[in-house]
Amino acid sequence: MAKKVDGYIKLQVAAGAANPSPPVGPALGQKGVNIMEFCKAFNARTEKFDKGMPIPVVITVYTDRSFTFETKTPPASFLLLKAAGLKSGSGRPNTDKVGTIKRSAVQEIAETKAADMTGADMDAMMRSIEGTARSMGLVVED
């Protein structure tokens, strides 16, 4: 018989840096999940990522307090800032441009995010990433 799902928890945790402090501890504690077990498993699974890279994770909690989790690809905004070599985007993206990014870098990011994105094809996914770049104050050039 399949386990009964008690709920889902969506978090964004730094790769290799999951610990019982907020936001991880309180979110898992509410559902009665073993916090240290999750932290060890998450840190082991995210070893391949750069330390500190934000990784979205969806935790499925079952009624017997066991859990499974699925990691996603890092947010497009983080990947764009990393590719452009910036710390943050523009507070006023329509007037203040903070940097430029090449279309080839946008394509690499779209390929990285392809598993998590629902775009019909690569061109649509690239346009979505370009829109994110523009909303951050980045100029996309060929």
From Swiss-Prot:
<dbReference type="GO" id="GO:0003735">
    <property type="term" value="F:structural constituent of ribosome"/>
</dbReference>
<dbReference type="InterPro" id="IPR000911">
    <property type="entry name" value="Ribosomal_uL11"/>
</dbReference>
<keyword id="KW-0687">Ribonucleoprotein</keyword>
<comment type="function">
    <text>Forms part of the ribosomal stalk which helps the ribosome interact with GTP-bound translation factors.</text>
</comment>
<dbReference type="Pfam" id="PF00298">
    <property type="entry name" value="Ribosomal_L11"/>
</dbReference>
<dbReference type="GO" id="GO:0070180">
    <property type="term" value="F:large ribosomal subunit rRNA binding"/>
</dbReference>
<dbReference type="GO" id="GO:0006412">
    <property type="term" value="P:translation"/>
</dbReference>
<keyword id="KW-0699">rRNA-binding</keyword>
<keyword id="KW-0694">RNA-binding</keyword>
<comment type="subunit">
    <text>Part of the ribosomal stalk of the 50S ribosomal subunit. Interacts with L10 and the large rRNA to form the base of the stalk. L10 forms an elongated spine to which L12 dimers bind in a sequential fashion forming a multimeric L10(L12)X complex.</text>
</comment>
<keyword id="KW-0689">Ribosomal protein</keyword>
<dbReference type="InterPro" id="IPR020785">
    <property type="entry name" value="Ribosomal_uL11_CS"/>
</dbReference>
<dbReference type="InterPro" id="IPR036796">
    <property type="entry name" value="Ribosomal_uL11_N_sf"/>
</dbReference>
<keyword id="KW-0488">Methylation</keyword>
<dbReference type="InterPro" id="IPR020784">
    <property type="entry name" value="Ribosomal_uL11_N"/>
</dbReference>
<dbReference type="InterPro" id="IPR036769">
    <property type="entry name" value="Ribosomal_uL11_C_sf"/>
</dbReference>
<protein>
    <recommendedName>
        <fullName>Large ribosomal subunit protein uL11</fullName>
    </recommendedName>
</protein>
<dbReference type="InterPro" id="IPR020783">
    <property type="entry name" value="Ribosomal_uL11_C"/>
</dbReference>
<dbReference type="InterPro" id="IPR006519">
    <property type="entry name" value="Ribosomal_uL11_bac-typ"/>
</dbReference>
<dbReference type="Pfam" id="PF03946">
    <property type="entry name" value="Ribosomal_L11_N"/>
</dbReference>
<comment type="similarity">
    <text>Belongs to the universal ribosomal protein uL11 family.</text>
</comment>
<dbReference type="GO" id="GO:0022625">
    <property type="term" value="C:cytosolic large ribosomal subunit"/>
</dbReference>
